[in-house]
Curated annotation (Swiss-Prot):
Belongs to the amino acid-polyamine-organocation (APC) superfamily. Amino acid transporter (AAT) (TC 2.A.3.1) family. This is Lysine-specific permease LysP. Keywords: Amino-acid transport, Cell membrane, Membrane, Transmembrane, Transmembrane helix, Transport. GO terms for molecular function: amino acid transmembrane transporter activity. Disulfide bonds: none annotated. Signal peptide: none annotated. InterPro entries: AA-permease/SLC12A_dom, APC_YAT. It comes from the Bacteria. It catalyses: L-lysine(out) + H(+)(out) = L-lysine(in) + H(+)(in). Its main location: membrane. Permease involved in lysine uptake.
Length: 508
């Protein structure tokens, strides 16, 4: 094992050295990414990017906490919020497709300080999330190989993810396409088997009516509250986490071959498929598994996944191993997407002067290679979990908890300003290549809901023995304002008047 690991390390060092040399010889004149993502890549990245551990593992906790219909209500509410956010992002992304996405939009349509803070917030979010996912990869593989040190699996996963992102954006898109296809296939298979079980064709008799109505007619804890973690409000956070990653669609617009066609196509079809997948999956779980079933609680492994429970009840004895492989696919996909998103955000910040210019350099394949190395350096935090164990892993998860919601808030504010500026400058809204739904109601509702969910992230963590975890989680909020105010005072920026907003369609 020591010899093979040494060989792997040497190969990685040689690979990195070659890429750095290649980058140095080509990047002096290259500062552009390449539009190589096809429509099918964009659609599948948007679809598969949100189907992951949130659905496969934590959905059981949501059903147990809020009840069958409470869980469905929570996912519908969050789904509606995300729908409005993504149509807002879709309108801006088709008008100005850029790798900086909402960071660029915040800079152009709100205030350069706002875009600066959004960009660094999002880069940090995904860079840390990559470290979390690499740790999760090790946990998945230890399901089969419990005696092998975890850091070896994390290292192998890091090398794979780094290599995919270092080759070309087309390689990234193709990899995500097939990883997403695996997840979608499992969900479709789950729904087919689930409904066959509900109708009594497989798995024997199931008392669906009882499972769905027990305990306050399917609502446990009623409306609930953010602080107690019960009821519908108490699970909105978990439901929100499940949908995080949908905003990746905006970042892929910067490298899509034909964003004016591929982005609207993805927006018009993908969101509803995601929502249907989630709602139908939650319904099947709740119909087959009583919310009082202890197996639904604390689902942090494939063996406790609601998918595993359903598969086992219809006779799939190796369901746990199958679902562990699927979860492994999900976390590798998440790490891959996270590496891509954070690299492109750092690249975009550098292009706009918000980060050192060296991060804007690209290889001949259009890869922001120095930005990729910087993101990989942060991802190395995963190896500290081998030293400090579960406690450090928990802190990493907490650190990335709020940043995704802050990005959503930024999308809503940026779009509201974009549309108002568009009208203020006498432009015809009908000529926009894509229209967000129900403006201004949509972004305003999404903004209010996102702020409520963000501020309601289990504030009780700040008290008692969990105060460190609470402080780390809520640190994202003051960090955002430090970045925002620091840039604002240094560069004397102000809220851009609507008639002075830059509505040109050429970014680079």
């Amino acid at each position: 094992m020591r010899v093979s690991l040494s060989l792997t390390s040497r190969c990685r060092i040689n690979f990195i050295r070659e890429r750095i040399l290649e980058n140095s010889s080509n990047s002096t004149t290259e500062t552009q990414v390449k539009r190589a993502l096809k429509s099918r890549h964009v659609s599948m990245i948007a679809l598969g990017g949100t189907i992951g551990t949130g659905l496969f593992l934590t959905s059981g906790d949501v059903i147990h906490t809020a009840g069958p219909f409470g869980a469905l209500t929570a996912y519908v509410l969050i789904g509606a919020m995300v729908y409005f956010l993504m149509t807002s992002l879709g309108e801006m992304a088709t008008y100005l497709p850029t790798s900086g996405s909402f960071s660029d939009y915040g800079t152009r349509y709100v205030d350069p300080a706002f875009g600066f803070a959004l960009g660094w917030n999002y880069w940090l979010n995904w860079a840390i999330t990559v470290a979390v996912d690499l740790t999760a990869v090790a946990l998945c593989i230890k399901f089969w190989l419990p005696d092998v040190p975890s850091w070896i699996f994390s290292l192998i996963a890091l090398i794979i993810v780094f290599s995919i992102n270092a080759l070309s954006v087309k390689t990234f898109g193709e990899t995500e396409y097939w990883l997403s296809a695996i997840k979608i296939t499992v969900v479709v298979l789950f729904l087919i088997i689930g409904f066959l079980s509900i109708f009594g064709i497989m798995g024997g008799h199931i008392d669906v009516a009882k499972n769905l109505s027990v305990g306050n007619h399917g609502f446990v804890g009623g409306l609930g509250s953010f602080t107690t973690g019960g009821g519908i409000l108490g699970v909105l956070l978990v439901a929100g986490f499940s949908f995080q990653g949908t905003e990746l669609l905006g970042i892929t617009a910067g490298e899509a071959e034909n964003p004016e066609k591929s982005i609207p196509k993805a927006m018009n079809s993908i969101f509803w498929r995601i929502l249907v997948f989630y709602i139908l999956s939650i319904f099947v779980m709740a119909a087959i598994i009583p919310f009082t079933d202890p197996h639904l609680v604390g689902g942090n492994s494939a063996a406790q996944s609601p998918f595993t429970i359903v598969f086992e009840r219809v006779g799939f004895s190796i369901a746990a191993s199958i679902m562990n492989a699927v979860v492994l696919t999900s976390v590798v996909s998440a790490a891959n997407s996270g590496m891509y998103a954070s690299t492109r955000m750092l690249y975009s910040l550098a292009k706009d002067g918000g980060a050192p210019k060296i991060f804007s350099k690209t290889s001949k394949n259009g890869i922001p290679f120095i930005a990729l190395l910087a993101t990989t350096a942060v991802a190395l935090l995963t190896f500290l979990t081998s030293i400090y164990g579960v406690s450090f892993f928990t802190l990493l998860v907490s650190a990335s908890g709020l940043t995704g919601f802050i990005a959503w808030i930024g999308i809503a504010i940026s779009h509201f300003r974009f549309r108002r500026a568009y009208v203020a400058q006498g432009k015809d809204v009908k000529k926009l290549p894509y229209h967000a739904k129900l403006f201004p109601f949509g972004p305003i509702l999404a903004l209010i809901m996102t702020v409520l969910v963000t501020l309601g992230q289990d504030p009780m963590l700040l008290f008692g023995k969990t105060w460190v975890q609470g402080v780390v989680m809520y640190a994202a909020i003051p960090l955002f304002f430090i970045l925002y105010l620091g840039y604002k005072f240094k560069n004397k920026t102000k809220l851009i008047p609507l008639k002075d907003v830059d509505l040109s369609r050429h970014k680079d």
